[in-house]
Design a protein with these regions (language model features):
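N-terminal polybasic phosphate/anion-binding patch
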Residues: 2-80
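Anionic-ligand binding patches
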Residues: 54-194
Length: 194
């Protein structure tokens, strides 16, 4: 289990991210810190399955992967304050593929927040490999001569020359997924998982 912390005088809230990927745990820590400044957080990652294909091929499949990751992380680490699922996916559009990710957050009280990142098109060379069954990260590594790019800048970082990194790409969606937790007096339809 990997762990990162942002500390203050308060007892840290325990946040379990359903991934060991440091990009995802870092984005979650930064999102919580920006949305709730002054809080104390202990973020750890756990390896759990998404129960969807390694490369989700639709919006719904990708969202379901994020929600499944929360469920599986909660089973593994039931004593957290929050569980977060981050699932990247692609959506076919003819021969092209749009790339995006879903972020889902659930509190120990059962409140849920969900948000999707911005969407961009992957290069056709990458799309051809995805269409042949390859995962986006592996396709990018092959096309761009990288190694394990999904734990660094990711596809979005490669294509933007790190103007947008995979971490910065996720942070905004983490913040948006936290809206129901910032506005507890309001009701959001995303408060129901699934």
């Amino acid at each position: 289990m990997a762990s990162q912390e942002a500390t203050s005088q308060a007892t840290p809230q325990k946040i379990v991210v359903a991934s060991l990927n440091p990009v995802k745990t870092g984005a979650v820590l930064e999102g919580f810190t920006r949305m709730f400044p002054g809080g104390a957080y202990q973020v750890s990652g756990v390896s759990v399955p998404s129960d969807v294909p390694d490369q989700p091929l639709s919006d719904q499949e990708t969202l379901q992967g994020a929600l499944n990751r929360i469920k599986n992380a909660r089973s593994l680490e039931p004593d957290a304050d929050f569980w977060v699922g981050v699932e990247g996916g692609v959506n076919p559009e003819g021969e092209a593929f749009q790339s995006f990710a879903w972020i889902a957050v659930e509190s120990k009280e059962g409140r849920t927040g969900k948000a999707r990142t911005a969407t961009y098109y992957v290069a056709q060379e990458t799309a051809n490999l995805i269409g042949g069954g390859m995962e986006l990260g592996h396709a990018d590594d092959l096309i761009f001569g990288k190694t394990n790019s999904k734990q660094h800048s990711g596809s979005v970082g490669i294509l933007t020359d790190d103007v947008v990194t995979r971490t910065s790409y996720y942070i905004q969606a983490v913040i948006l997924a936290l809206i129901p937790f910032k506005n507890t007096q309001l009701t959001f339809s995303s408060n129901k998982s699934g």
